[in-house]
Regions:
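Bacterial N-terminal signal peptides that target proteins for export
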Residues: 1-9
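Bacterial N-terminal signal peptides
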Residues: 8-18
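Short glycine/proline- and aromatic-enriched beta-strand/turn motifs that initiate or cap beta-hairpins
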Residues: 20-81, 204-211
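Predominantly the C-terminal beta-signal and adjacent terminal strand-loop region
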Residues: 39-52, 167-211
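Transmembrane beta-strands of outer-membrane beta-barrel proteins
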Residues: 47-55, 86-92, 118, 136-142, ...
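Residues that define the transmembrane beta-barrel architecture of outer-membrane proteins
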Residues: 49-51, 66-72, 112-120, 156-162, ...
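Extracellular loop and loop/strand-boundary signature of outer-membrane beta-barrel proteins
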Residues: 60-63, 105-112, 148-154, 189-194
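Gram-negative (and chloroplast) outer-membrane scaffold detector with strong preference
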Residues: 70-149, 208-210
């Protein structure tokens, strides 16, 4: 009788052990299923959008009376958002105005206004694809420039710089693209006094890298 009782206990123990081993993988899988959303929350998913960096070089020639200031600009942008054909970019601009201007009371006296400026900039771009390799866009850029001296002469040492115009881009491959634009610009400090705003038109060459 004792032997039969011991055999029954042994059989029951083996069955319990087998059930526990079989249930372990299911519990582990369930735990992993629960952890996955948390891991995605902290680590992000692998399906992240591409980042785009762009560098642009401009040359603008002056337009308007008594304003003889040409611009050489260098911009570096990073795209941070894209939606419905519109993209948003933030960046940095370095500008080198060269030339002079004349006050209204002394139109023949040219005041040297060469300077170097730097400041944050922001670009909004509307893009329309033209096939697999080409795209056309309209760029609108605004920036706050701070100069190493008063610019233009006899005014202030800061300005707002605006650019607008069409751009044509050619994609060499999925990562590299080259563009050219025809832009107009306006520079002004936004004040009622000491604000000889000036305008210009010119070309811009850009290189974009997708990573």
């Amino acid at each position: 009788m004792k032997k039969m009782y011991a055999a029954a206990l042994l059989t029951a123990g083996v069955l319990c052990l087998t059930s526990a081993v079989s249930a372990a993988p299911s519990q582990t899988a369930a735990q992993e299923t629960v952890k996955t959303p948390l891991q995605q929350m902290h680590m992000g998913t692998s399906e992240e959008k591409n980042h785009r960096a762009e560098i642009q070089a401009d040359y603008f020639q002056h337009r308007g009376e008594r304003r003889y200031i040409n611009l050489y600009n260098l911009h570096v942008f990073r795209q941070y958002k894209e939606m419905h054909g519109m993209s948003l970019h933030w960046g940095l601009t370095v500008t080198r105005p060269v030339g002079s201007w004349a006050e209204k009371d002394a139109p023949t006296v040219r005041l040297d206004s060469g300077a170097v400026g730097v400041g944050p900039s922001y670009m909004v771009r509307w893009t329309k694809p033209l096939g697999k390799k080409w795209e056309a866009s309209l760029d609108l850029t605004g920036g706050l420039m701070v100069y190493n001296k008063v610019h233009p002469a006899h005014t202030r040492n800061y300005d707002f710089m605006w650019r607008i115009g069409p751009r044509l881009t050619y994609h060499f491959n999925d990562r590299n693209a080259l563009s050219i634009a025809y832009l107009g610009h306006h520079v002004s400090n936004g004040q009622r006094t000491k604000n000889p705003g000036y305008n210009g038109v010119g070309v811009s060459i850009g290189y974009r890298y997708t990573y």
